[in-house]
Amino acid sequence: MSLLNVPAGKDLPEDIYVVIEIPANADPIKYEIDKESGALFVDRFMSTAMFYPCNYGYINHTLSLDGDPVDVLVPTPYPLQPGSVIRCRPVGVLKMTDEAGEDAKLVAVPHSKLSKEYDHIKDVNDLPELLKAQIAHFFEHYKDLEKGKWVKVEGWENAEAAKAEIVASFERAKNK
């Protein structure tokens, strides 16, 4: 089955499927799944010696304001393989702006059927403060050595904001 056929979720916006592009703690290589072919491409080698603090992927059949599917960070006890799909629950969103405009990153935790470890996390404020700081620090600095690129982290928003972003981006993609 092609990743292109993976639905956005089981019960939007509460129960989503995230297609993983970059595993947590991986080498500083940005991978992207081509949305037309489903192939995993090397997008670029990151200039900074940093790694993604969480698994990084997207929700199929969504369209964020930056023109791409909605980006999602997924903390897990182990790194996930690129191209894998994980069932999740959205808990928050990191609002940012970069050189191209608005760029939000959702945070979602594994669904209870996969692990009970995250059942107590209902909102981004339930995540460990250190993890939130690592995520914000990563995105504030991962483009530092790339000429003409920058990121400004604006802050965290709650689970309801994340769910609203999912619904809006799903509708945006449907109406495109």
From Swiss-Prot:
Reaction equations catalysed: diphosphate + H2O = 2 phosphate + H(+)
EC number of the protein: 3.6.1.1
GO cellular component: cytosol; membrane
Alphabetic keyword roster: Cytoplasm, Hydrolase, Magnesium, Metal-binding
Annotated Mg(2+) 2 binding sites: D71
Binding annotation for substrate: K30, R44, Y56, Y142
Record-level GO BP terms: phosphate-containing compound metabolic process
Gene3D superfamilies, per the entry: Inorganic pyrophosphatase
Entry GO MF terms: inorganic diphosphate phosphatase activity; inorganic triphosphate phosphatase activity; magnesium ion binding; zinc ion binding
Keyword Nucleotidyltransferase applies: no
InterPro entries: Pyrophosphatase, Pyrophosphatase_sf
Its job: Catalyzes the hydrolysis of inorganic pyrophosphate (PPi) forming two phosphate ions.
Family, per entry: Belongs to the PPase family.
Protein name: Inorganic pyrophosphatase
